[in-house]
Structure formats: structure tokens, C-alpha cells
């Protein structure tokens, strides 16, 4: 059964009611980073923290950079770095910095790790060589470590519903509506031309709203509809064109129908247009292309670098402590196992010794019983028991001869 958006982790865990809720989460992450840097062990004093607004500015710059990377790479190979990867990667980036501060994790590394992870999730071939060292002076292992921290911050909730897919579905529905109005002749040529022109314009508007907080406050299908309506309103002719998008939205979604089937009370047409207009008016908080903003970005970046370096030092020390503690636990387990093995070996040796003594006693008992039986048999037959007699030896060690034998030796004569 197809799961609705409202039942997804994206809706349950990564959608917020207002911009104030997002600001509160970012402020909490900022304060946690300041505390972490201030309470670090060691003699080195931490660099002064940057304001939260400056951290948000540097994040906005790298969100814009992420879209540039996708567009440049997609121009070389249209099958890679598609809009699906763009939206998924930017969603990862936004979610990460809801719970982390750019003072403790370099946004450039997170941007590249988001793209690399999004390629896996969206099943597009993006390899490390596409990202490093082309876009950052990072070792591949360092980027893989950032990817792991990214997944941990995302709580491994990696499936992202994209407005680009919803936009394609809406355009197909609009095309069917226009064709039905044309009757047997089908959609008129001007309507088809306008539909074709609406698609790239709507995509651009989706990309623009991605730079704002809209993906964290509105479902993707509503983002797609707002982009389509905004593109139609901004197109030449607007409502005077061959297609009336507002009339189609009113007919399609203004009644009992809803963008999300699980929505309990679909909004009225008036309320829906109000929501779509608010989404379309959401703009990025910072114009990172402006000259004055560029200068501010350079200053913020120079202040962030020592903070990130200090945070890495803290993290490295923490990892070393954890590794040392884990090694101590392993040594303790090895020693405990060694003691158990020695105790088991001692117990086995004791058992072997007991068995040996029992076998020796049993053998002695059998020999004693056999000797007694032989003596009794000899006595019954009138025989002397067998006795071993030891011969005497002379001083030279030779056996002493009997007297008759000695006399016989003396009487031997040798004749010439």
C-alpha cells in the first residue's frame, strides 16, 4: 500500500509549523555549540563565537553553491546530479544545520557529503572523485567521516519526497484538463506551447523556494503547486493566456479533493490560494550574490575557520578518550578471559591428577592381590616361593667362583 506523505518521517520529524519554531531550533544548536567550545578541556582558549545570523549566512551561501554544483555537473551529464539529487541533498543540508552549528562542522564538507549521500539514496552514480578534490581540499576518508556524522544527525531518516516529481504529475493533470476542454481536437497549440514553457519556469521557482525555509514548513506537493501557479502568474499574459491555471486549481483542489489524501479538512479554494501565495512569496533570507554580502561572507568565513579547527580538536580528543576507554574495556575482558582460562586449566590439571592417583591406587591394589594369590598357590603345592638371590662379588667386581671351580683352575698345566 502506498504510504501518504503525512505518514512519512519527513512529515512527522522534519516539518514545522512556523518560522519561529525553526529559529528556536537553530538558536538551541548555536547555544549548544558555544557551550561545547567554552567547556572544552585543554589550555587553549576557544576563539570567540560568531553570531547565529552569521552562521545562517554561511549556510545560505553553501546552499546556493550546492545548486550551482548540481547544475554544472548536470550540464555535463544529464543523467547525474538531477533535480531529485538537488532537492534531497539540500534537504539533508537544511536538516543537519537545524541541530548543528556551522561553528562545529564545516558547511563545505556537509554540502559535499549531502550530495554524495543523496546520490546513493536517489540511485545516481556520484563517486567521491566527482566531489574531491574538485570542490574541496578534502581527503576521501575525511568526507566519508562527515557523511557518517550527517546520517547520525539525520537519525538515518534518508527518504525525501520531492516537489519535482509532484510538479511533473501536476503538469500531466493540467495537460489532461486542457485536452478535455479542447474536445475531439485535443489541446490547442497555444495551450501546449504555454504548458511547455511553464515547466522550466516552475522548476526555477522550486529551486528558489528551496533556498528559503519553505521545504521545512510545507509539503512537497504544495511547493510544486505554488511554483506552478507562480510561474503562470509571472508568465507573459498571465490569466489572459491559453491556460487558466487558477480555474484548474479551483476545480481540481478547491472542493473536497486535497493534495494529500490524509489531510483531514481540505482547505477552501480561497484558503488554498492564500497558502500558495505565501509559499511563492517566501524568499531566501540572504542574497549571497550581492557585493556587500560577499564581503561579509569573507569576514564570517575567516572567523569560522579557527572555530571549526578548535571543534575538530575537541572532537579528536573525545574520540581518543572513547578509543582509550574501549581499549581498556577490551583489555579487561581479555584479562578476565585469561583468568578464566587459567582457572579452567588448573581445574583440569587437578582432575587429571586425581584420575592419575586413582589409577595408580587401582593398579597397586591389583598387583597386591595377584601377589597374594601366587603365594597361596605355592604354599599349597609345597614349594618355596621364588626368591631372587644376589651373588657375592670380589674386590675387583668379578663374581666369586665356587671352591671346586677354583681348585680345578689351579690344577691346569700347560705343556710345551
Q: What do the predicted segments below correspond to?
A:
Residues 54-269:
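Structured all-alpha helical bundle cores of eukaryotic regulatory proteins
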Residues 1-109, 120-130, 144, 149, ...:
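Acidic, Ser/Thr/Pro-rich regulatory low-complexity segments at or just upstream of the first helical elements
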Residues 210-225, 229-416:
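C-terminal region detector
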